[in-house]
């Protein structure tokens, strides 16, 4: 899973693409409505004008997608560390985490030393056991 900043960048890229798609759709499929009653309705024989119901339905879908993406972006922004946290609090948290990391690293080193000690003890026991078996076989042969 990607980090939150990468997710945020991807969402921003997606919403920019959605805005562009919406503008392109409106530009290519809108009806030529005059701004006021005094103007004549324009037309373009090469234009592909969508039916009013289809146009409205598609606009609703495009806006819903943009609203959902905006909510996702807001949620990601709110989840970022440091939002509503002062610089001093962030530095204090970093210092606390560094101390905890040093402690955990110390525990890790102790665990590794313990593992090595136990491994050495087991190797010695195995060697003693195999030597004992070898000695008993020699005594039985003699």
Swiss-Prot record:
Cross-referenced SUPFAM superfamilies: Mediator hinge subcomplex-like (SSF140718)
UniProt cross-references to Pfam families, sorted A to Z: Med21
Annotated GO MF terms: transcription coregulator activity
Gene Ontology biological process terms, A to Z: regulation of transcription by RNA polymerase II
GO cellular component, one term: mediator complex
Keyword Disulfide bond: no
Record localization: Nucleus
Keyword line: Activator, Coiled coil, Nucleus, Transcription, Transcription regulation
Record-linked InterPro entries: Med7/Med21-like, Mediator_Med21
Residues forming coiled coils: 87-131
Family the entry assigns: Belongs to the Mediator complex subunit 21 family.
Subunit-level organization: Component of the Mediator complex.
Biological function: Component of the Mediator complex, a coactivator involved in the regulated transcription of nearly all RNA polymerase II-dependent genes. Mediator functions as a bridge to convey information from gene-specific regulatory proteins to the basal RNA polymerase II transcription machinery. Mediator is recruited to promoters by direct interactions with regulatory proteins and serves as a scaffold for the assembly of a functional preinitiation complex with RNA polymerase II and the general transcription factors.
Name of protein: Mediator of RNA polymerase II transcription subunit 21
Source lineage: Eukaryota, Fungi, Dikarya, Ascomycota, Saccharomycotina
Gene behind the chain: SRB7
